Amino acid sequence: MRSMNLTKNAKFESVRKNIEHYLSTDWFMWVCFLIACFITVLRVEVIGLLIFAAIICAILVFCEDVIVALEPFLLLCLCLIKCNNSYDEFIKMVWLAVPAAAAIIFHFNYYQRKLPHGELFWPMLAVSVAVTLGGLGKITAKEYFSLMPIFFTLGLGFGMLLFYNLMNSHVRLRENYSLPDKISKIMIIMGLFCCFMILEYYGEHLDKVISTHGLLAFQWRNNASTFLIFALPFAFLRSIKGNHGWFWVGMLFYGCMMITGSRGGAIVGTAEVMMCMIALLCLDKRHRIHNIIIIAVGIVMFFVFFWDLIYFFRDMLLRLLQIDDNEIRVRLMRRAVEDFLSNPVFGRGLGYFGNRDVHHSAKGALC
């Protein structure tokens, strides 16, 4: 089938390989980064969805290597984290599912490969079964088969198993580049764009920062800090393996994570940086003395500006230290225990909406 496709589409193959070569370059990754920056500055997330959807569809058609689509996909996800409660706006874009499905079907048909069972197949299968059977005996058939629950149940259940098998067959070691190196570049560019979003927001509201001498509160801070948590280790990894300048990129990620004001980001990010520092000192022997000096200076600067930092981060620290019993997170934790005890084997399931009295999720979302 593969050889027949190549013979039949020789002209397409010639054009395709040239396009794939460009789309696989670092230059194209930075072009996507700049597009995402313009989308953020101009506040045109809906147009951004169209642009990146077109880019991803083009990649699926012209690129055998699906890893190329990862960077624009992550940048698109970051662009959309600002769009809170936008179900009514984005549901109008549901027609995009048609070209997206066509591109996906074309890709996995034209670039056919066997679907081997990877090392995680059986654990993924167990998770898929658990998600599918979730809520058994506790929710009604109407609740289970309503639109949003069944969408998430299929997508996060056997849909993820199918996705894993497809990716496992198409993402493989390449001769022209190192896969770990490629992924680290993608994650770092994603992190840099996230930093751009945060710093751009601070720049736009700089007068408020100066007047309050404190953090800005914004709706998407937890999402942004989550993306930075994923990106941060890759900067330190590149610092260990190559240019020491990547160390400062990692510190930029941590700094931006802190100024989001996310409590989870502050806790996890600080622990993550500490682990990365330990790895850096143990593995990067060439710059060990240099790194020790930098860390020592950083600790001294922290204590010199201790009270200034405490004042700047006061809102986050207060929210971290003064957790009220009626806070949504605390009530949800309590409710989680109750829900588990009510059905220890199958749980409540993704179709259960009985916790909306504690936290009313956005339209089109489960939580």
PLM regions: where:
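Structural signal for the C-terminal ends of transmembrane alpha-helices
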Residues: 41, 57-66, 101-114, 162-176, ...
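Alpha-helical transmembrane segments of multi-pass inner-membrane proteins
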Residues: 53-56, 132, 154, 158-162, ...
